[in-house]
Amino acid sequence: MFKDVPDPADEGDDPIAATFAEMDRFGIETGLFGASPDALEAKRRDPKRVALSLEVDPNDVMGAIRKVRAARAEHDLKAVTLFPAGCLPQVPVDDPKAYALYAACVDLDLAVVVNAGIAGPRFPSDCQHVMRFDRVCYDFPELRIVMRHGAEPWEELAVKLMLKWPGLHYMTSGFAPRYYPKAVIDYANTRGADKVFYAGYYPMGLSLERIFDELPQVPLRDHVWAPFLRENARRVFALE
């Protein structure tokens, strides 16, 4: 799906040091990382540079909730992530199994990041239809929800829902800056400066070099850049 996927660190290299070096190179103060063993070690080395998220499968309802509670207590977890189309069986955004997870996130003051729109892998994608977020936002007004990976082809609907629901946000993960949806950028430049924020896809599909080479061409207004690159993520993920 991606061209020029970043090369992994050479065998024998320290992936944590390599990642910190890339962050330094592009002026990245803090990154959100999945809670892998390497990410836990990176957080031990430099807690201020590493915030942690946890991917869970809500099919194991109580098991997922216990994992989230433990990660919050032990590792200062900042977000839970959910890939509805990638669960087996699939768990739609508005499924009762996901609702149990959302309730736990409200109790623990955690943001939840959910894939929205057509999935990249060749999976059925109705479970990620953007309209499903409407009911979730209604039922969980305290929940901080972030749509990730595009929300296409329903990006205009995503904007309408962000206008409607205070807790719904959008991050630009999975897309090179030149392909950010126009409807989302237009929204960020007008009524959504506090709702849209940067996310990359390093090292899964995009190099930081490509991302930061293309970012200056994104037509954001001057006052939108600070919320887009820093302030919105710090607020949504409760970063210090």
How would you label these PLM feature ranges?
Residues 78-79, 92-197:
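Catalytic pocket-lining loop regions of alpha/beta-barrel enzymes
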Residues 1-30, 192-197, 205-240:
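Mid-to-C-terminal alpha-helical segments outside catalytic/metal-binding sites
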Residues 34, 83, 199:
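Conserved residues at the C-terminal ends of beta-strands
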Residues 61-66, 178-183, 207:
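Short, charged, surface-exposed secondary-structure boundary motifs
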Residues 12-22, 60-72, 155:
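Short, acidic/polar
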Residues 21-29, 46, 107-108, 139-143:
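A structural motif corresponding to the C-terminal end of an alpha-helix
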Residues 23, 71, 105, 149, ...:
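Conserved, mostly hydrophobic/aromatic
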Residues 29, 37-120, 124-127, 164:
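Active-site gating/metal-coordination segments in enzymes
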